[in-house]
Amino acid sequence: MSSSPVNVKKLKVSELKEELKKRRLSDKGLKADLMDRLQAALDNEAGGRPAMEPGNGSLDLGGDAAGRSGAGLEQEAAAGAEDDEEEEGIAALDGDQMELGEENGAAGAADAGAMEEEEAASEDENGDDQGFQEGEDELGDEEEGAGDENGHGEQQSQPPAAAAQQQPSQQRGAGKEAAGKSSGPTSLFAVTVAPPGARQGQQQAGGDGKTEQKGGDKKRGVKRPREDHGRGYFEYIEENKYSRAKSPQPPVEEEDEHFDDTVVCLDTYNCDLHFKISRDRLSASSLTMESFAFLWAGGRASYGVSKGKVCFEMKVTEKIPVRHLYTKDIDIHEVRIGWSLTTSGMLLGEEEFSYGYSLKGIKTCNCETEDYGEKFDENDVITCFANFETDEVELSYAKNGQDLGVAFKISKEVLADRPLFPHVLCHNCAVEFNFGQKEKPYFPIPEDCTFIQNVPLEDRVRGPKGPEEKKDCEVVMMIGLPGAGKTTWVTKHAAENPGKYNILGTNTIMDKMMVAGFKKQMADTGKLNTLLQRAPQCLGKFIEIAARKKRNFILDQTNVSAAAQRRKMCLFAGFQRKAVVVCPKDEDYKQRTQKKAEVEGKDLPEHAVLKMKGNFTLPEVAECFDEITYVELQKEEAQKLLEQYKEESKKALPPEKKQNTGSKKSNKNKSGKNQFNRGGGHRGRGGFNMRGGNFRGGAPGNRGGYNRRGNMPQRGGGGGSGGIGYPYPRGPVFPGRGGYSNRGNYNRGGMPNRGNYNQNFRGRGNNRGYKNQSQGYNQWQQGQFWGQKPWSQHYHQGYY
């Protein structure tokens, strides 16, 4: 009998993960892997004994089996499998939807190797988040749920005697490996990519051998080296997701706010999209949910100055807890405060004429850093001074009223009377400002200094304003294959129209992740690939935020499929929607991609390029666009080239699989027995379109898969099993776990998605997913939005 107080074999998957998180160990993998890892850690804690030995570890079935009959073991195993399946069923069903989407989506057909490669990349992208422990990441849950069902469920179904014989030998091998890794806290950014053979051997040692044989091509958890899995590959994976759902409804327009334009405040136009500004425009924070925790967010004040001696105050109100991001090597909280020109970017201190003082006690300008002043923290107040009355413009700071001296000196000739604007850059922090609106400042200021709000209006300079109406806003969608020259065109066009466009592309997202000091930390620890994987995920949510803003945008992505074009442009209803097609000659395209591969390395596998060629569709004015521009080949020539590409794709790739039309699958259970009884027939996890009481023994348990036409919560809102009526919960009532409201019925449309009912399940905030439309906007209308805690941020279309 093990001396450990934790009996590992009796823990569910969620409990195993919780125990592993307490010990700062990785919680990814199949249930067998989690059990081995936890048991090894427990053995080490108990005194460094071997991780798994027959008769000594709590996982050994031999001692327990002696006191129970075989039938009892089978019943316990079946009950455990059902409980685990209930926990993970939604994730598994979501995983099935992913597979169907891959088959039916814009990617077309692919051979078995290509499909495995996609699944492995999707797993790498979202499962091993390398330090980014994201509870809301639906793709990570898919991998865990599907993996646990496929692996652990097979183990549970083994006869007790066979299980007892197999486990000791399995545990010894896996336990030694786990023991070696659990000697200290493990950074989850560290990822080991094992060769396919070794990885398969590990899975078989974990009890997943039968599943691999039965599953055929569905090999989950197999990781492969990714020589050609760079930025382009993750963009390609993200782009395919647009083929899986119906076109979204246009977002609800923002309410027109009547705000006194003479007041100095944070400017809602001159800020990042993910910079959350309060309604009074005097406080703000960066978004922190999901992958946004990696991004820096900044904004400027509405007015700047070019004369006198002026100041403003900034208080760090909170370092927002980022519970889904754990790392001991990366600074996850930071604030920079200072001044910049209106032509400068939002990354304070990363350009010329952009001056910032950091929470770490560092001053930064044009990516050059130097120690300055003191470090500051929560509840500290930083006063920023700009003195234009000396021979050189002097920028200085004070911490809690204590002068820190001059930080920057700027030549007036170089500055050329251009105004400087208050500017802040946040990384998982919340701040508030005093531009002079307070009757009494946080700390006294020199008598000869004036708050910027108190400077006469004629001596202040208003920052640039955005379009007044949505009809005046412009969105330009780039369309073209990877490496065709889209970004080159965007860079040139933006330079010809300075300050007009917000560019939404992977490059811009990466820039907001890799601020100079942070970039160096990531490079030193070898974690840049984490950002590379997260950037395309953020970009999709950026586009949804952008559709609510009155600005001009350029979408710098491939957008080759008709589905991606349609679904993105549907969000921008009311905008001037334009398309720019970059389609060079085939010879030119080959030269460009070869040159790019020589400089940046190959980042997209050949089969992915072939799929994109096969799905390349030229846009039409009548559909989603008001205007279409062809940069190189014109429409007729481009159409001929695309026909050539489609033939090339068709010959190189296997025949396209038959698409799922959405009809019900035939019931494989021909017995016709009670399908809502656990004991026989189909368990009724999903797929039934229940319109009335056509079932036995009262209403079935609320297992989360029946189409109730929106009348009741789905997951856990009402429990019950067997003949218990649906109003009676099986256990603790958690309406709206956050999965699809129709989670499991074969007709997956028609109802709002992800997070429809309960907004606070398990403390994950107000909306697990980001596609719920009605709930989020109601929340905004009810005035609850700014009452939320910052760490409860979960993006949805009405969020912001």
UniProtKB/Swiss-Prot annotation:
Protein name: Heterogeneous nuclear ribonucleoprotein U
Gene it is expressed from: Hnrnpu
UniProt entry keywords in alphabetical sequence: Acetylation, Activator, ADP-ribosylation, ATP-binding, Biological rhythms, Cell cycle, Cell division, Centromere, Chromatin regulator, Chromosome, Citrullination, Coiled coil, Cytoplasm, Cytoskeleton, Developmental protein, Differentiation, DNA-binding, Isopeptide bond, Kinetochore, Methylation, Mitosis, mRNA processing, mRNA splicing, Nucleotide-binding, Nucleus, Phosphoprotein, Repressor, Ribonucleoprotein, RNA-binding, Spliceosome, Transcription, Transcription regulation, Ubl conjugation
B30.2/SPRY domain span: 244-440
SAP domain mapped to chain residues: 8-42
Residues binding ATP: G480, L481, P482, G483, A484, G485, K486, T487
Region feature Actin-binding, mapped onto this chain: 587-602
Biased composition (Basic and acidic residues): 209-242, 647-659
Coiled coil (UniProt feature): 626-653
Gene null: resulting phenotype: Mice exhibit early embryonic lethality between 9.5 and 11.5 dpc. Mice show retarded development of embryonic ectoderm at 6.5 dpc and growth retardation beginning at 7.5 dpc.
PTM-bearing positions, type Omega-N-methylarginine: R678, R709, R715
UniProt biased composition (Low complexity): 71-80, 103-113, 153-173, 194-205
ADP-ribosylserine PTM sites in chain numbering: S182
Region (RNA-binding RGG-box): 690-715
Marked site (Cleavage) residue numbers: D94, G95
InterPro entries from the UniProt entry: B30.2/SPRY (IPR001870), B30.2/SPRY_sf (IPR043136), ConA-like_dom_sf (IPR013320), P-loop_NTPase (IPR027417), SAP_dom (IPR003034), SAP_dom_sf (IPR036361), SPRY_dom (IPR003877), SPRY_hnRNP_U (IPR035778)
Region (ATPase domain) residue spans: 464-648
GO terms of molecular function: actin binding; ATP binding; chromatin binding; chromatin DNA binding; double-stranded DNA binding; double-stranded RNA binding; identical protein binding; lncRNA binding
Chain positions found as N6-acetyllysine: K17, K21, K181, K241, K328, K492, K500, K527, K541, K611, K789
Modifications made to the protein after synthesis: Cleaved at Asp-94 by CASP3 during T-cell apoptosis, resulting in a loss of DNA- and chromatin-binding activities.
Ranges where the record places region Disordered: 41-257, 647-729, 745-774
Chief subcellular location: nucleus
Quaternary structure, from the entry: Oligomer (via ATPase domain and RNA-binding RGG-box region); oligomerization occurs upon ATP-binding in a chromatin-associated RNAs (caRNAs)- and transcription-dependent manner and is required for chromatin decompaction. ATP hydrolysis is required to cycle from an oligomeric to monomeric state to compact chromatin. Component of the coding region determinant (CRD)-mediated complex, composed of DHX9, HNRNPU, IGF2BP1, SYNCRIP and YBX1. Identified in the spliceosome C complex. Identified in a IGF2BP1-dependent mRNP granule complex containing untranslated mRNAs.
